[in-house]
């Protein structure tokens, strides 16, 4: 029986020249020669490059089917692997049979016809866009990065924890959350005071989609020592920018008995590990991005993995920015949250390497970050990368109950709403640290694709929840 193989296996030499093989996939192009030959390029998504199938006009269905094949038709091709005289490919298939599995019913209206489409147009046909070179390459890189993240944490002795998507707490204290409710919007139950009676809702109280798995993750870190979460998170932020999604994935490790320095080391090790993985495993896709999207993709990643991370205190970073003589759009002064232009100046022009900025003013950071001895700053950190700015945000968590309570009250939160989170500090508290990595932001950095909506299969953003 003829072996069925992926196109990746054939092109990478897993199937020997002279061996008979069957590949299954979709037609990218067909061209016919006057000499009675047809050349099909067939892809199956297993790698960037398609395979070329040479078809003689003496096969049974040549006139009836092969000459009618158009982009998008699905086929099963059986033939012998032969060395290719053509440039850019080592082997091709000398075809014996072509079975047409599915036709494109009307080639003239097929949205993925064989021409280059704008990335904006592809968002309108998100169900078909993985058939294109660019989105297919993004999907493979996304998979590679996800697998590398899981592998890294497993090798480091971390446990993966599934944190809930439905929650009653706001991790960031930002309030931009999607409500989860089964109440009849046409007939909302009311309390005597006239407010919505959430006691009659599914959970008996207000519930939301999570903005972060961090608080839940901390509970497991304070029992299993090293954990990470990796899952979807949601922000009801009305931002129509190239950097924002309403639904995105987050990687959030938490480590017990860890300081901010341990946290920064973990972030550096993880990023270098996953970038090395993608440079090794998805070179073909990165070469495509380098050629057609961002010429610096490969050199940027190689520079990143070979650069020691710089470290600087926020206060010193402000000093560097003030003394730079550069005119920034957003003025620089102590107490501001660094904007993208500030972050990129530090990483790209000042340090020319990834940099960890740490010890931020407490007023611009979340309640759970550990208050430093100066009483003005917290043990927070951001990892800034050349080419994008902030890629990771994290902190040492506040392990002292009295300080945590005070911070909550300062920020207008009710400590009683976080009773279970406070329990971690009451029963065997430990210093612990963690960070958050926006997964799609990581993919943007690796691929050079500029819009975050193009690195997630079905983007969710204001007024857009199609498919």
UniProtKB/Swiss-Prot annotation:
Top-rank taxon, per record: Bacteria
A GO BP entry: asparaginyl-tRNA aminoacylation
Enzyme class: ligase
Location within or outside the cell: Cytoplasm
GO CC annotation, single: cytoplasm
One GO MF term attached to the UniProt entry: nucleic acid binding
Keywords: Aminoacyl-tRNA synthetase, ATP-binding, Cytoplasm, Ligase, Nucleotide-binding, Protein biosynthesis
InterPro entries: Aa-tRNA-synt_II, aa-tRNA-synth_II, aa-tRNA-synth_II/BPL/LPL, Asn-tRNA-ligase, Asp/Asn-tRNA-synth_IIb, NA-bd_OB-fold, NA-bd_OB_tRNA
Catalytic activity: tRNA(Asn) + L-asparagine + ATP = L-asparaginyl-tRNA(Asn) + AMP + diphosphate + H(+)
UniProt keyword annotation of Acyltransferase present: no
E.C. no: 6.1.1.22
HAMAP family linked: Asn_tRNA_synth
Binding partners and assembly: Homodimer.
Family: Belongs to the class-II aminoacyl-tRNA synthetase family.
Protein name: Asparagine--tRNA ligase
Record organism: Actinobacillus succinogenes (strain ATCC 55618 / DSM 22257 / CCUG 43843 / 130Z)
Name of the gene encoding the protein in the UniProt record: asnS
């Amino acid at each position: 029986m003829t072996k069925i193989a992926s196109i990746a296996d054939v092109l990478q030499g897993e199937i020997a020249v002279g061996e008979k093989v069957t590949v299954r996939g979709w037609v990218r192009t067909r061209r016919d020669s006057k000499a009675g030959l047809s050349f099909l390029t067939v892809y199956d998504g297993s790698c960037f490059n398609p395979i070329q199938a040479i078809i003689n006009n003496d096969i049974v269905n040549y006139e009836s089917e092969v000459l009618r094949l158009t982009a998008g038709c699905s086929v099963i091709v059986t033939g012998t692997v032969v060395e290719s005289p053509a440039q850019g490919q080592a082997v091709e298939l000398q075809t014996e049979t072509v079975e047409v599995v599915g036709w494109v019913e009307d080639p003239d209206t097929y949205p993925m016809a064989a021409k280059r489409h704008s990335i904006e147009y592809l968002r309108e046909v998100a169900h078909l866009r993985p058939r294109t070179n660019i989105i297919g390459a993004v999907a493979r890189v996304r998979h590679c990065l996800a697998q590398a993240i899981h592998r890294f944490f497993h090798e480091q002795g971390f446990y993966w924890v599934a944190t809930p998507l439905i929650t009653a707490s706001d991790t960031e204290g930002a309030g931009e959350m999607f409500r989860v409710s089964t109440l009849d919007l046409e007939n909302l139950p009311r309390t005597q005071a006239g407010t919505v009676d959430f006691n009659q809702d599914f959970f008996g109280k207000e519930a939301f989609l999570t903005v972060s798995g961090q608080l839940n993750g901390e509970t497991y870190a304070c029992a299993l020592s090293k954990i990470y979460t990796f899952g979807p998170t949601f922000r009801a932020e009305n931002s129509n920018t190239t950097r924002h999604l309403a639904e995105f994935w987050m990687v959030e490790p938490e480590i017990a008995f860890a300081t901010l320095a341990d946290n920064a080391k973990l972030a550096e090790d993880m990023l270098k590990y996953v970038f090395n993985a993608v440079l090794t495993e998805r070179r073909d896709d990165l070469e495509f991005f380098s050629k057609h999207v961002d010429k610096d993709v490969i050199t940027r990643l190689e520079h990143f993995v070979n650069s020691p991370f710089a470290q600087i205190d926020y206060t010193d970073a402000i000093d560097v920015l003030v003394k730079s003589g550069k005119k920034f759009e957003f003025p620089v002064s102590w107490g501001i949250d660094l904007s993208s232009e500030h972050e990129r100046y530090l990483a790209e022009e000042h340090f020319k390497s990834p940099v960890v900025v740490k010890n931020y003013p407490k007023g611009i950071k979340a309640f759970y970050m550990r208050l430093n001895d100066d009483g003005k700053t917290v043990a927070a950190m951001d990892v800034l990368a050349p080419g994008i700015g902030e890629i990771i945000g994290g902190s040492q968590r506040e392990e002292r109950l009295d300080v945590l309570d005070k911070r909550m009250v300062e920020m207008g939160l009710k400590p009683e709403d976080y009773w279970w989170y406070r329990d971690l500090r009451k029963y065997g508290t430990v210093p612990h640290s963690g960070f958050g990595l926006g997964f799609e932001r990581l993919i943007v950095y690796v691929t050079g694709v500029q819009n975050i909506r193009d690195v997630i299969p079905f983007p969710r953003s204001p007024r857009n929840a199609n498919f």
